[in-house]
Design a protein with these regions (language model features):
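Bacterial N-terminal signal peptides
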Residues: 15-24
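Sec/Tat signal peptide C-region and signal peptidase I cleavage site
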Residues: 25-31
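Extracytoplasmic "Venus flytrap"
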Residues: 34-54, 74, 160-164
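Short beta-strand->loop
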Residues: 39-44, 130-131, 150-164, 191-192, ...
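Short, polar/charged alpha-helical segment
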Residues: 47-64, 168-173
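Pocket-lining segment of extracytoplasmic ligand-binding domains
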Residues: 94-96, 104-105, 116-118, 132-135, ...
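A conserved helix-loop-strand patch within extracytoplasmic ligand-binding domains
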Residues: 112-161
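An extracytoplasmic/periplasmic, membrane-proximal ligand-sensing/linker region
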Residues: 175, 196, 203-204, 208, ...
Length: 335
């Protein structure tokens, strides 16, 4: 029956066309690729490894994509680079983002273009480490004792232009021992890069150092092999003052995290977070966030220090609001 055959042929043709269209749409969706620039820091550090992990995660979800790590002066520089659209995404510390959005030095005006994608780590605490003999001889039990005793202490902070230096100064100020106070008591506050801080401690040119480092960092282990060390906590009141100023988080270094420390140490921590611009393509932000959620193991594996990272922690940044597209992904994941 020719009429029935014609209908059958037309139905087959229509079905084939629909199948081809469906396959085409599916392939088009799967073929989404990204070529993104990530602003990081100097080459060779943990942020470089995180850049590689982010690249691997995005590649896994969107084959053919590339996230190129661009070296920079660090998080403070990245606030400006992201604001100026010199990169698509950037790693920035929470305190650096706070400086940007609040217009604190070195920024001359507030930067209101930032949006959070994900929190990457929260375990780089401000460690107040000193010579065990100095701490014992002066009866120090906390950072605040320096102010109470008006000690002529020699403290070394991170170099100028580094946000950790600003947080260290904020801790001293909140404890009642500002750099000016310490100088008036006959002491000194100097500024040096992390490796130089260790040298000053080894050479007995500094009594205390304050720096943001991972617990049990190799530089601290090396210093402990040359100098008997002890650690000082801050009080909850000091912690809250600095948290209010910098929107950072408190942190407890556990007893026996070091074999030379036997008590819990309250301090503060700076956190690294991944940012985009508020006006970034929502689909890009959603896809990158989803790639991180789906492939968190690619970030965990870049360094043993990243093992604690999970999706819940990614969703818990507080300093700058999340991009709505990133927030949507975390909400769908239950956070």
């Amino acid at each position: 029956m020719p009429g029935r055959n014609i209908v059958k042929k037309n139905w087959i043709a229509a079905a084939a066309a629909a199948l081809i269209l469906t396959i085409g749409v599916s392939q088009q969706a799967h073929a989404q690729t990204y070529n993104l620039t990530l602003c990081g820091a100097s080459p060779g550090g943990l942020w470089t490894l995180l850049g590689a992990g982010i690249d691997a995660a995005v590649k896994k979800s969107f084959p053919g994509s590339t996230v190129t790590y661009q070296t920079s002066g660090g998080g403070l520089a990245n606030v400006g680079l992201l604001n100026d659209k010199k990169c698509d995404i950037a790693i920035i510390h929470d305190a650096e983002a706070k400086a940007g959005v609040a217009g604190l030095p070195p920024f001359k005006a507030p930067v209101d273009s930032l949006a959070t994608i994900a929190q990457l780590y929260t375990w780089a605490p401000m460690q107040i480490i000193g010579s065990k003999s100095y701490i014992a001889e002066n009866g120090l039990t906390s950072l605040e004792d320096i102010a109470a005793k008006k000690l002529p202490v020699r403290i070394v902070l991170n170099r100028r232009g580094n946000i950790v230096r600003a947080v260290g100064e904020a801790m001293l100020n909140a404890a009642g021992a500002s750099p000016k106070d310490i100088e008036s008591w006959g002491g000194s506050v100097t500024y040096a890069a992390s490796n130089e801080q260790g040298d000053q401690m080894r050479d007995r040119r500094a009594d205390l150092m304050i720096n943001s480092l991972f617990v049990n960092h190799s530089s601290i282990r090396e210093l402990a092999s040359a100098v008997d060390l002890a650690m000082l906590p801050i009080t909850p009141e000091t912690a809250q003052k600095v948290i209010g100023e910098w929107d950072i988080q408190d942190f407890t270094i556990k007893a026996n995290d070091y074999d030379w420390n036997d008590k819990d140490i309250l301090t503060l921590t700076v956190s690294a977070q991944l940012f985009a611009r508020k006006d970034a393509d929502p689909k890009m932000v959603k896809d990158v966030t989803q790639a991180l959620v789906d492939n968190v193991a690619d970030l965990q594996s870049v360094h043993k220090a990243m093992a604690p990272l999970d999706v819940k922690l990614m969703s818990q940044a507080k300093t700058v609001p999340y991009h709505p597209a990133a927030k949507e992904v975390f909400a769908a994941a239950g956070f």
